[in-house]
Amino acid sequence: MPRFQKNDNFIDKTFTVLADLVLKILPATKQEKEAFSYYRDGMSAQSEGEYAEALENYYEALRLEEDPYDRSYILYNIGLIYASNGEYVKALEYYHQALDLNSQLPAALNNIAVIYHYQGVKASEKKELDLARTLFDKAAEYWKQAIRLSPNNYIEAQNWLKTTGRSDTLTI
């Protein structure tokens, strides 16, 4: 049964209806429509915590989608799933692939920074201070890029940069 037929969530149902209308109205090839349908189903499954199903849909959307900008969002969402499952190396790979296609994706930059920060905290707890410092510096660089793209977001990151003395090159 297609995902849109079993949605109980009002927001998901609304999104599905709107997405179907957009697909009917906008000129798109059959392949583009099919790619978007898989992407939509992936987002719906992801929002319900059905990560395996979401990944299947995203991979199929990725296979069909040719537009680099649209592919960047598919890759970003795949990264989100891997990060949610604690598979940070894979998440980083997908976030970087998304950025290769769309360098104006502050959420991917932020999520990379969050992973490096988390790894820095873990290294600190293990008293691996040089590694922790390196990871925190990497987090700082990615947060600075995200903040440059979206200066009104990432307030906590801005505060962290200031309190850790890493905001010296932050120009918004």
UniProtKB/Swiss-Prot annotation:
It is a peripheral membrane protein. It is found in: Plastid, Chloroplast thylakoid membrane. One of its GO terms (cellular component) is chloroplast thylakoid membrane. InterPro entries: PSI_Ycf3_assembly (IPR022818), TPR-like_helical_dom_sf (IPR011990), TPR_rpt (IPR019734), Ycf3/AcsC/BcsC/TPR_MFPF (IPR051685). PROSITE patterns: TPR, TPR_REGION. TPR repeats lie at residues 35-68, 72-105, 120-153. Its main location: plastid. Keywords: Chloroplast, Membrane, Photosynthesis, Plastid, Repeat, Thylakoid, TPR repeat. Gene3D superfamilies: Tetratricopeptide repeat domain. GO terms for biological process: photosynthesis. It comes from the Eukaryota. Essential for the assembly of the photosystem I (PSI) complex. May act as a chaperone-like factor to guide the assembly of the PSI subunits. PANTHER family: CELLULOSE SYNTHASE OPERON PROTEIN C (PTHR44943), TPR REPEAT-CONTAINING PROTEIN MJ0263 (PTHR44943:SF8). Belongs to the Ycf3 family. This is Photosystem I assembly protein Ycf3.
